[in-house]
A protein has these predicted regions:
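Short acidic, Pro/Gly- and aromatic-enriched capping/linker segments at domain boundaries
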Residues: 44-61
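A gly/proline- and charged-residue-enriched helix-loop-helix capping module
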Residues: 74-116
Length: 334
């Protein structure tokens, strides 16, 4: 690894503040913790902490008591299809949705066993499962959740529920800041399919943005950042993300990341996927890195982009790729 003039954490924060980084940031400059005392991390098979969590113990109820089942073929969980949905109509939420008592979770124990887990030279974060739309889906199924976003008759009930969910997320984040002193909340909410968004930008602005903005405002007021994990072909929803106060978005590769960088990179940091899978050659991966770097070079002081390097080729040298990107861009921002 080449010598760096500042820590990877400091460089990442420069990017998020739209200050000039010293080299092009990469996702490997970050690290995250998802401890097992949070029910959703077990339910969603996403425990990341000092001690590995046994795969046979994943699944089960999330923080709202919704049961999840682990599906080995997709390496992830889904709501238990044999259990009826909690809500048939969003107006039922006050009687049926039971919010978690987070003070009953063992925060002190989780902090103690993970005391040395986080690499403080990197940017630290935790994931929050699930975001507004995904949580609504877990309560009432996809079709009813989608209808709730556009049904004028339930608008007041929907906003009341989403406001309560925002309160819940803020309390979650407050405790993670207190016990783990993390830099960022990684908010998990998918808004689209491979071809298009699930809803319009108008719906996103009216129904989701006000509540996301409360969460991002809390993060910013408490020295944190707000990252949105949002899958799908959702280029049209970028204005809503910006209005929600999102600092960076790690979207999927079917989106034109370079085009979005050109259009919105002065207001949100866009993550460009750098995939090195079994079918990619080293030459292809390095050539893409070169193309992206040369594209951002002329506007590097005004707009922000980072690489999401996904190395899934057993013969690939991931660290050599990262050193190549650092050496090629170190000094580029001077």
């Amino acid at each position: 690894m080449i010598d760096l003039p500042i820590t990877r954490r400091e460089n990442w924060i420069r990017m998020l503040k739209h200050e000039t980084p010293m080299w092009m940031p990469m996702y490997s400059d970050t690290c995250f913790i998802m401890p097992s005392h949070v029910p959703d991390n077990i339910a969603r098979a996403m425990v990341v902490e000092a001690e590995p969590w046994p795969i046979e113990k994943v699944g089960g109820p999330d923080m709202f008591g919704i049961p999840w089942v682990y599906v080995p073929t997709v390496h992830g969980s889904m709501e238990d299809p044999d259990v009826p949905h909690l809500l048939e109509d969003v107006s039922e939420w006050r009687e049926k949705v039971k919010f978690p008592d987070m003070d009953a979770w063992d925060w002190a124990g989780a902090a103690e066993r993970n005391r040395d887990f986080l690499d403080r030279s990197r940017f630290t974060t935790t994931w929050f499962f699930s975001g507004m739309f995904e949580r609504l889906i877990s309560f009432m199924g996809f079709e009813n959740a989608a209808m709730a976003l556009i049904d004028d008759d339930c608008e007041d009930d929907l906003h009341a529920l989403l406001d309560a969910l925002a309160d819940n997320c803020i309390e979650f984040t407050r405790r993670f800041k207190q016990w783990f002193d993390i830099d960022c909340l990684y908010f998990h909410d998918d808004w689209g399919s491979q071809r298009s968004p699930f809803f319009s930008v108008r719906v996103a602005r009216e129904k989701l943005v006000p509540h996301l903005r409360r969460i991002s405002d809390w993060c910013h007021a408490n020295g944190m950042f707000f990252e949105l994990h949002c899958c799908g072909m959702i280029e049209d929803l970028m204005p809503a993300m910006i209005e929600a106060g999102v600092d960076n978005w790690c979207g999927q590769s079917m989106n034109d990341k370079v085009g979005l960088f050109d259009k919105y990179g002065d207001r949100i940091a866009v993550g460009e996927t750098l995939m090195w899978g079994p079918d990619n050659t080293k030459e292809e991966v390095y050539a893409k890195a070169d193309r992206v770097i040369e594209h951002i070079r002329p506007v590097r002081h005004e707009k922000t982009m980072y690489f999401m390097e996904m190395v899934m080729n057993k013969d690939a040298d991931a660290e050599a790729l990262r050193d190549y990107i650092r050496s090629k861009t170190l000094g580029m921002y001077d």
